């Protein structure tokens, strides 16, 4: 930071930040006590504006391309100094936080923000430690200045806004954007780069634990059900989005949740509903004339959000971590209506589907996405956040599955009986019944039937689920049309997978066109 900053609020409380945000006109107080803020034109992540500084220490280990775009060190330093100078005479908010609920693998991070509500977001989503940085590790710095306007020709950015990660300097710079999710995803990308070198698998997943200490992981892209399904009244939540899987443990990388709010209902998502109260930040949620949030209103964006600390969840795992997972669930939202609601995977199939990351962009978190739903392949169920080559993460996944003996399942939260627009989407109670059968261990030894084209093993019965739903061909009125769509999907899988250099055992574990 630049010298001479005045009016610094250091480690401010929730009440202080809410009060300051309201006083400064950054947001409104809602009827349920939450603070609602609007993010302007950017209502999602801006992947085209995200860069990693290209420097000797990390250059060889990063997969450079459209996701990880290089930025020159000298250009970064110049821009960092310009943003620091911009903040030097402003009221700013600073907190000492941590990323990673593990004494060995945490990162200390000092977060400086121009907005009070951004600081509240950071304190909700990162971990507020009892004693900051007990191991005395080098501290990371996040500097977030949404009011700063970048000049692409001068600064080397792609637009007026940017997100830049610098591993050598341990710095993250955010300038020109109000969407707060960029802060959490930046530090997730940092841990995604650092953890594999320590033999820890970083994961874009949610996690919960049962009364008997059995951990379950839920992988999936935004909108596939990670947050909803892990917020289970019968289990204890570890976290809803980012975790590390180390030998002996699964730990949360964060200290809070960032839940999608579109169509949120008390009936279907009681845990999330109850977590939205004083201290929660609502992003781009529209209020009615009595300031009651209208969760059905997508006039600002489909990507409406609630950011709250884990303390807002009654049934949570206090220490923010658990044992290794007995069950691992890959959530896919299949818009073609071809995939079964649940399949059991071998470890090779798990690696195949992990690398494929087949799903749909549902109410996408990325800028420029509309409500239209389209299928996508997102490596490791989170391609935008993984700096290393995909094979690094797939190998670590197979190693952890093999060493611990986890059972992996592919669960379709998308369509059946026809593609999007024709068939119907699996309802949340059906998916919950499937997940209940998975976490109870009932599906581990159940009889299965083989689906040839998809190369998947499907249970013949699942408690609480209509048997007719289990084999997808039975839900289509036109069986020939189903085979046609299944063939098309198998071909898409194969075309996407051709880019991976992996053993034949993994290559052959996917659909057969």
Swiss-Prot record:
Q: Which GO terms describe its cellular component?
A: cytosol
Say if the entry is tagged with keyword Transmembrane: no
- UniProt xrefs under InterPro entries: PEP_carboxykinase_ATP, PEP_carboxykinase_C, PEP_carboxykinase_N, PEPCK_ATP_CS
The pathway this protein participates in, as annotated, is: Carbohydrate biosynthesis; gluconeogenesis
The protein's required cofactors: Mn(2+)
Gene Ontology biological process terms from the UniProt entry: gluconeogenesis
Q: Provide the GO MF annotations for this entry.
A: ATP binding; metal ion binding; phosphoenolpyruvate carboxykinase (ATP) activity
Principal location listed in the UniProt entry: cytoplasm
Cellular localization per UniProt: Cytoplasm
The record's comment on cofactor binding reads:
Binds 1 Mn(2+) ion per subunit.
Answer yes or no on keyword Iron.
no
* Enzyme class, first EC level, given as a word: lyase
- A single Pfam family it belongs to is PEPCK_ATP
**According to its UniProt record, which reaction does this protein catalyse?**
oxaloacetate + ATP = phosphoenolpyruvate + ADP + CO2
Q: Where does Mn(2+) bind?
A: 185, 204, 241
* Keywords carried by this UniProt record: ATP-binding, Cytoplasm, Decarboxylase, Gluconeogenesis, Lyase, Manganese, Metal-binding, Nucleotide-binding
EC number(s): the record gives: 4.1.1.49
Subunit (UniProt): Monomer.
Summarizing the function annotation, the protein's role is: Involved in the gluconeogenesis. Catalyzes the conversion of oxaloacetate (OAA) to phosphoenolpyruvate (PEP) through direct phosphoryl transfer between the nucleoside triphosphate and OAA.
Q: Which family does it belong to?
A: Belongs to the phosphoenolpyruvate carboxykinase (ATP) family.
**Protein's name in the database:** Phosphoenolpyruvate carboxykinase (ATP)
Report the gene name: pckA
């Amino acid at each position: 930071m630049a010298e001479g900053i005045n009016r610094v609020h250091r480690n401010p409380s929730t009440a202080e930040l809410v009060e300051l945000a309201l006083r400064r006109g950054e947001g409104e107080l809602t009827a349920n006590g939450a603070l609602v803020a609007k993010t302007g034109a950017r209502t999602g992540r801006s992947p085209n504006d995200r860069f990693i500084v290209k420097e000797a220490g990390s250059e060889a280990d990063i997969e450079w391309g459209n996701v990880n775009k290089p930025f020159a060190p000298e250009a970064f330093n110049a821009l960092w100094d310009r943003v620091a100078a911009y903040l030097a005479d402003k009221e700013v908010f600073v907190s000492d936080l941590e990323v990673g609920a593990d004494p060995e693998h945490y990162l200390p991070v000092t977060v400086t923000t121009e907005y009070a509500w951004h600081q509240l977001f950071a304190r909700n989503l990162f971990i507020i430690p009892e004693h900051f940085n007990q191991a005395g590790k080098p501290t990371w710095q996040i500097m977030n200045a949404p009011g700063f306007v970048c000049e692409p020709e001068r600064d080397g950015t792609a637009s007026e806004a940017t997100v830049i990660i610098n591993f050598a300097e341990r710095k993250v710079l955010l300038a020109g954007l109000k969407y707060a999710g960029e802060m959490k995803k930046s530090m997730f990308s940092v841990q995604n780069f650092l953890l594999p070198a320590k033999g820890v698998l970083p994961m874009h997943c949610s996690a919960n634990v049962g009364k008997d200490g059995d951990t379950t992981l839920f992988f999936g892209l935004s909108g596939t059900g990670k947050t909803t399904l892990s917020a289970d009244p019968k289990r204890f939540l570890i976290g809803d989005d980012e975790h590390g899987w180390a030998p002996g443990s699964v730990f949360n990388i964060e200290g809070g949740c960032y839940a999608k709010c579109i169509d949120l209902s008390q009936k279907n998502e009681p845990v999330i509903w109850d977590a939205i109260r004083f201290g929660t930040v609502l992003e781009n949620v529209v209020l009615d004339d009595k300031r009651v949030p209208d969760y059905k209103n997508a006039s600002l964006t489909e990507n409406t959000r609630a950011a709250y600390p884990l303390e807002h969840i009654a049934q949570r795992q206090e220490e923010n971590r658990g044992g290794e997972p007995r069950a691992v669930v890959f959530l896919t939202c299949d818009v073609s209506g071809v995939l079964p609601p649940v399949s059991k995977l071998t470890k090779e199939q798990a690696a195949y589907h992990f690398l494929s990351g087949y799903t749909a962009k549902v109410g996408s978190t990325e800028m420029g996405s509309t409500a239209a739903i389209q299928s996508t392949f997102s490596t490791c169920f989170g391609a935008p956040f993984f700096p290393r080559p995909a094979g690094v993460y797939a190998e670590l996944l197979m190693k952890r599955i093999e060493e611990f003996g986890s059972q992996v399942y592919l669960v379709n939260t998308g369509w059946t009986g026809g593609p999007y627009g024709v068939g119907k989407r699996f309802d949340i109670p059906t998916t919950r019944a499937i997940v209940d059968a998975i976490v109870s261990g009932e599906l581990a030894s159940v009889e299965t039937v083989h689906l040839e084209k998809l190369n998947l093993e499907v249970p013949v019965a699942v408690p609480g689920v209509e048997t007719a739903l289990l084999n997808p061909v039975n839900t289509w009125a036109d069986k020939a049309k189903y085979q046609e769509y299944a063939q098309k999907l198998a071909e898409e899988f194969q075309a996407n997978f051709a880019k991976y250099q992996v053993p034949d055992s993994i290559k052959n574990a996917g659909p057969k066109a």
